[in-house]
Structure formats: structure tokens, C-alpha cells
Regions:
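Short amphipathic alpha-helical segments that mediate assembly, nucleic-acid/protein binding
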Residues: 2-3, 313
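Sec-dependent N-terminal signal peptides
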Residues: 3-13
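Hinge/lid segment of periplasmic solute-binding proteins
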Residues: 111-127
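N-terminal secretory/targeting leader peptides
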Residues: 17-107, 123-333
Length: 333
């Protein structure tokens, strides 16, 4: 009898329908991001031998990040990859978006790694399983004219993404004249000369072809843009343990690859590819750099808990101090 029950159980498992996770991202199809996303889906299906599949809706087909998030909550999608929505689900991730706090991509990756247990729990409480974090990159300045002083930057109309509340608050507190709109409205407003400059990640400017419409870029890291990959608890929890492990392992490979690709692409763009497109590289005077970071610190201090819990900011600053000290000691060896 036990043998018959075991046989029936095995037959039931063998005949089980493959599970398909419906995922969304606003990454335009044909970009390096989209290719990495599709490679992740292929890896999941291959390793699971077809038992688990990931179907992606790219290029904003499922709506912007907030619309897609609502669709996940209503069961129309199972997960999402992106940037702005991540901070809504895991508020501590706002620490990675604070302007003027980080000098390199590696610093953000280090901090997010240290915060991962906290982030995992915040995602879980919001109804999601955290498959991983990554970094799109550092926002740099694109403009119609070269900007060499803080006074010139404050006098310039500056575009800010409507789904980026942390940078919106900081930019306004720093005295910038902000024009807020969606990504879809970015190019039409630029062509109408509704604004004259914007901060964004180099690979983002390339993906949305914004770099073909501007004239100058200045390479100094103003803010960092973190990313995440999540699946709803409702979709993740029922998965067999083996499929959960496969999904997590494939996601880890994807996030590592995402960081590598983003780093390589951004470095190539700011070190020559943009200039081949016709952009001119505007130098960043030390005074502008110093004044920008000083203004960013004043904004962080003044906004306080409106941006991030003071205790979390203090903890992150301590982490950064430790990381930078480790790097200094390593260079002396």
C-alpha cells in the first residue's frame, strides 16, 4: 500500500504543470539590462528542467514601476525588477539613494550587503521575497551648457524623476530649481526646452536615448541608484524547496552579472563612448564638487527623518567609514 501511495505521489509530481512567474521591468527591450534579464529567465528554466519559468514584460508594458507594483499586489503579476519601487517596499534602501553620501559604486554595494538582513525583513513584511539588490550606477550631470559653479547649477532648471522622492526632496533642499515628470515625459519636455539639465546614470541615458539629445556631461557621482529584484510572497511561498533554491541561485548570478555589466558600460560611456556620440565632457572644478557634497550633507542633516531614520543614517555613515578605512589600509600593503 505504501509503495502504491509513493508511486501515485511521484506520478502526480511528474505530471505537475510548470510554474510560470510573471515579472515586469521598465527596462527597454534590446538593452544590456533586458539581455541580462532574459538570460536570468533562461537559466531558471534550464536548471529547473522546465519546472519553473519566468515570463518578463519589459519596456513598461505592464505600466510604470508603481503601476506594475499594484498589479503584483492584485495578483496580475508575480514580481518585478527596477529601482524606485524598491524603496517603497524596503524603506531602509533609501540609504543607498542619499545624494552626496557615496563616492563609488563599491561603497553602495558594501552598505546594501551589510543591510541585507534588514532589507529582507522589510520586503517580507511588505509582501515580497527579496531575490537581491544591485546598483544601476552613479547619477552624473547632463546639460545643454557646461555647468562649472554651484551658482550656475542652482540657476539651471533641473529634471527629476517623478518616482524618485528622495532625490526630489534633497534637490529642492539644496536649492535646485526642479522640474518633476515621468520618464515617458522626459524627452518631450527636453525638446520643448522645459528644463536644461538632469542627473541620471550613464547607462540609463543611453537606454532611453537621452544622451543623443543633450550636449554636455560632467562625470561626478551625485547620487547612486539602487535596484532590486523581488517576487511576491504569494508566488514564492508555495514553490517547492528545490525550485526556491534554483530561483535564488539564478537571481544571485543575475544580480552579480547586472553589477558587472552596469559598471563596465558606465565606465565605457563616460570614458569615450559619449564623446563618440557627439557629447562634450565638461570638467568638474574641485570647488563645484566640494560645494555640491557640502550642500548635500546640509540637506541630509536638515531633512533628517523625512528622508531616513537618523539611527539608520548614523549606522550607514559608520559602515562607510569602516569600508573606506579598510580600503586605505589595503592600498598601503
Amino acid at each position: 500500500m505504501r509503495a502504491l501511495a509513493a508511486l501515485l505521489l511521484l506520478t502526480s509530481v511528474a505530471e505537475a504543470e510548470p510554474v510560470t512567474l510573471r515579472m515586469a521591468a521598465i527596462a527597454p527591450d534590446g538593452t544590456e539590462w533586458a539581455r541580462s534579464i532574459k538570460a536570468f529567465a533562461r537559466d531558471v528554466e534550464s536548471v529547473s528542467k522546465g519546472e519553473l519559468k519566468v515570463k518578463w514584460y519589459l519596456g513598461g508594458i505592464a505600466g510604470d514601476e508603481m503601476v506594475a507594483l499594484e498589479r503584483v499586489k492584485h495578483g496580475q503579476l508575480d514580481g518585478q525588477a527596477g529601482a524606485s519601487f524598491c524603496q517603497r517596499l524596503a524603506p531602509s534602501l533609501r540609504a543607498a539613494r542619499l545624494g552626496g553620501l557615496y563616492q563609488t559604486r563599491e561603497e553602495v554595494i558594501y552598505v546594501m550587503g551589510r543591510l541585507k538582513p534588514v532589507l529582507d525583513e522589510e520586503f517580507r513584511k511588505s509582501g515580497f521575497f527579496n531575490l537581491g539588490q544591485a546598483v544601476f550606477g552613479a547619477d552624473v550631470l547632463f546639460s545643454r551648457q557646461p555647468i562649472r559653479t554651484m551658482e550656475e547649477l542652482r540657476a539651471t532648471r533641473l529634471w527629476v524623476w517623478s518616482l524618485d522622492p528622495i532625490w526630489q526632496q534633497m534637490a529642492q533642499e539644496m536649492g535646485f530649481h526642479t522640474i518633476i515628470s515621468s520618464i515617458e515625459e522626459h524627452s518631450p519636455l527636453w525638446r520643448k526646452k522645459s528644463y536644461d539639465a538632469f542627473f541620471t546614470v550613464p547607462s540609463v541615458a543611453l537606454a532611453y536615448q537621452w544622451s543623443t539629445e543633450t550636449a554636455y556631461y560632467s562625470d561626478f557621482p551625485a547620487t547612486m541608484l539602487p535596484a532590486c529584484l523581488v517576487v511576491s510572497n504569494a508566488a514564492f511561498d508555495p514553490l517547492p524547496t528545490e525550485l526556491k533554491q534554483i530561483l535564488q541561485a539564478s537571481a544571485a548570478k543575475f544580480m552579480n552579472r547586472f553589477n558587472e555589466i552596469s559598471t563596465q558600460l558606465d565606465e565605457a560611456l563616460v570614458n569615450g563612448l559619449f564623446e563618440k556620440q557627439g557629447l562634450k565632457r565638461a570638467s568638474v572644478p574641485p570647488e563645484l564638487r566640494a560645494e555640491f557634497y557640502a550642500a548635500a550633507k546640509r540637506a541630509r542633516d536638515k531633512l533628517g527623518a523625512a528622508l531616513i531614520a537618523p539611527a539608520l543614517l548614523s549606522s550607514v555613515e559608520k559602515m562607510l567609514g569602516e569600508f573606506r578605512q579598510q580600503r586605505r589600509e589595503a592600498t598601503k600593503r
